[in-house]
């Protein structure tokens, strides 16, 4: 068998083949059981909820909590995980085995195309959507959010605010300790390359700027791994209730490490060192250097207070609430 080609661009599929795979494989697997919109109240828009964060930030644990609430109030949403579309590429299974570092870049172009096609499919049927993305290509996030907005959807966004050292450590921990989030849905367990993490870490800042400056997003929450909220805002009649500060909040929280997070990080580093894997010590030293400045307790002196994420109560009927929701998840009609 010939060796895998090294040029990622050589794996991009012709448009016709890409469309066939979408129709034959992706629609039945990702969208086939959802039908069309179950919303009968003309005052309530379909909703698209984005959970975005760099690789290793903790999206795999945050998104399910949001999905449960969406299911309770509106029924099953389409759940799109951007990375999983790579597995539909015919070259992906071989590349994962023979050239793991090539698997993602070689299949990424088609995966991004399929994600956009899945979103278009959902929009055409008014299906609610929950979408997870690492924002390595922030323009994709912006395009998708704008597409949902232009189609009449309510767009809500949760941005994961996680320090660089913690998300890099999270990548190593989930892989070497074989945690479930190492392989989202039908993805095999994977060790995300450092450059991919760096790209998504930077891309998230661009996504935050888009949220602040675009009219496409109706509600935003900046949240940490433990569902602690640092910033929340909502548009009313096209304008933010508060000064737009998504990017500012994201940057502030990235420079802040909570005591519980540090305690867990120290234990994770100790456990990984105990595995005696030759390539780990240099990476752990880098991570410790990233976390070092955050271990100073004085860093948190002037940080804004955090509070728990507020979502609609599961099982509570109706659209009126006595508290301000960080994400309404489309449960509140526009005229209320």
Language-model segment annotations:
Residues 1-44, 205-336:
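C-terminal accessory extensions appended to soluble enzyme cores
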Residues 49-50:
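Short hydrophobic/aromatic beta-strand immediately N-terminal to the Walker A/P-loop
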Residues 54-55:
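The conserved Walker
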Residues 59:
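Conserved lysine of the Walker
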Residues 62, 66:
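Hydrophobic positions on the alpha1 helix immediately C-terminal to the Walker A/P-loop
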Residues 72-149:
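Conserved nucleotide-sensing/catalytic segment adjacent to the nucleotide-binding pocket
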Residues 87-90, 164-170, 229-232:
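Switch/connector loops and helix/strand junctions flanking conserved nucleotide-binding motifs
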């Amino acid at each position: 068998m010939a060796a895998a080609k090294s040029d990622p661009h050589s794996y991009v599929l012709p448009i016709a083949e890409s469309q066939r795979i979408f129709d034959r494989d992706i629609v039945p697997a990702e969208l086939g059981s959802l039908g069309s919109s179950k919303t009968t109240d003309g005052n309530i828009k379909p909703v698209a909820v984005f959970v975005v964060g760099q690789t290793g930030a903790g999206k795999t644990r945050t998104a399910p909590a949001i999905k449960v609430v969406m299911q309770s109030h509106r029924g099953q949403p389409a759940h799109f995980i951007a990375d999983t579309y790579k597995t539909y590429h015919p070259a992906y299974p071989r590349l994962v085995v023979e050239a793991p570092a090539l698997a993602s870049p070689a299949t990424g172009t088609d995966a991004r195309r399929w994600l956009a096609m899945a979103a278009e499919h959902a929009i055409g049927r008014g299906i609610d959507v929950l979408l997870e993305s690492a924002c390595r290509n922030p323009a994709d996030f912006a395009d998708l959010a704008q597409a949902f907005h232009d189609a009449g959807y309510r767009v809500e966004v949760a941005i994961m605010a996680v320090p660089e050292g913690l998300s890099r450590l999270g990548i190593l921990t989930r892989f070497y300790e074989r945690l479930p989030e190492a392989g989202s849905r039908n993805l095999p367990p994977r060790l995300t390359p450092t450059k991919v993490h760096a790209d998504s870490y930077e891309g998230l800042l661009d996504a935050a700027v888009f949220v602040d400056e675009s009219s496409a997003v109706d509600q935003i929450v900046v949240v940490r791994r433990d569902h602690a909220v640092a910033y929340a805002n909502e548009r009313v009649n096209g304008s933010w209730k508060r000064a737009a500060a998504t990017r500012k909040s994201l940057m502030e929280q990235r420079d802040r490490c909570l005591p519980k997070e540090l305690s867990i990080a120290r234990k994770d580093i100790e456990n990984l060192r105990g595995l005696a894997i030759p390539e780990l010590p240099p990476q752990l030293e880098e991570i410790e250097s990233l976390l070092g400045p955050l271990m100073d307790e004085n860093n948190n002196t002037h940080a804004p207070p955090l509070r728990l994420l507020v979502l609609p109560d599961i099982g509570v009927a109706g659209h009126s609430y006595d508290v301000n929701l960080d994400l309404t998840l489309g449960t509140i009609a526009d005229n209320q």
